[in-house]
Amino acid sequence: CYCNAPVCTPSRACMMTGKTMPGHGVYNLFDILPENEKMLPYYLREQGYETALVGKLHVSGTEYEVNKRNPGDGFDIYDLAHEPSVYTKAPYNAYARWLLENYPDEWRAIRAQGRKRKHRSAETHFSTWVSQRSAEVIRNRDKSKPLYLQVGYFDPHNPYDHYPLESEQLLHPEYYPEVIPDDVSAMPEALQLEAHYHCPATLGATGDTNRKIRTGYFAGVSFLDQQIEKIFQALKDEGIFDNTLIIYTSDHGDMLGDHGLYSKGAMFYEQGVNVPLIVKFPHQTQGCRSEDLVMLEDMFSTIYTAAGGDASFRPESLPLQGEKKHEFAMTEYRGCGKFDLMGFPHILHATMIRTAEWKLNLYHDTCDGQLFHLTEDPQEKNNLYHDPACAGKIMELMQMYLRYDTERDYNYNAERGGRSGIPGFAKAICEIKL
């Protein structure tokens, strides 16, 4: 499965609306989903579902979302919590309220230390709260209606050091994937600028630094795996596990040191844009693997179709149950949003087009790019963009993209919902040098 954008907000907005970015108007971290946009739970409620959110949503800029609900979110139960470490007094932070009521010392510690508070206890961890609250929603649901439950974990996510220490015991470092080496200085200039902005302290880091980051990432995943079992158990206790559609996915990936890069952004390597997608359909008894190209916007139509709805009003969103498949996957980056808040003269625009065999990454600001023949070069080490023999393939992929983008531009006329800033951030000064 490929994310529509390699950063949180636009990617999640695509998943929740069944549209790509020009359709809903959310392009970067601080954009606000227009108030006339209806999300998936809105339509599921029309199908007779009880709808619930526990945890992260992030379809609009955080400063907006922790203070105001989108009128079209469609949730009957709205236990939003953006992340574990900030906005502890915000109107919409169900995790902070739970901490204050049950673990006031931990609430005060997080209030004082923020993201610097490392290695939270398993008892007070964000993933623990999400799972426990989700299990409560399942057990206390309106049994006269079917339930749609959206579970939003924060992990795995930087700063990679808030996992419970005991979860390290679940790890087997000998099975960590080997780091894919690369020369960042040989990459397109726009990608270098992006990398220097997003991860200046760790750019090119190897050895102990990389092992520490990977340990934190995998420990967070392992602890999350344990917590998800609480939700499965609640479904089984209620006798509805077999009849439940379960989807596990993510809004973006993390480079974790591969190709010398960390974090996220306009980095279209598989580690950053190819996200997990695990699906259990109702009464499914046997597993299988699929090589079909799937996009996050497809989750909208997949769920709505399973609920008995007709998702044809979202033509870009292809249900997994259907026969029609994507000819190619596309990930778009229109800046993370921080550059223009800080007064930079322009933001970075980049696009990835990926077919079954090829991947083309276009950096529009610098007219440079990357081309990888994935069947022969799955680790994306050999950039063929400047190879004259590949000029025809680049043109073919660009025409494929332009044809699709023209059709999309004709069909969409989305509003923009405004911007949500971070207090004091607009006055910050940041100089990035290569």
Language model features: what each stretch is:
Residues C1-K359, G369, N382-Q399, A428-L434:
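Formylglycine-dependent sulfatase
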Residues N361-Y363:
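Short beta-strand micro-motifs enriched in acidic
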Residues A391-E415:
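A contiguous, mid-protein "functional segment" used to position or interact
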Residues Y410-A428:
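Short, charged, surface-exposed hinge/linker loops at domain edges
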Residues D377:
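Intrinsically disordered, low-complexity polar regions and short flexible loop motifs
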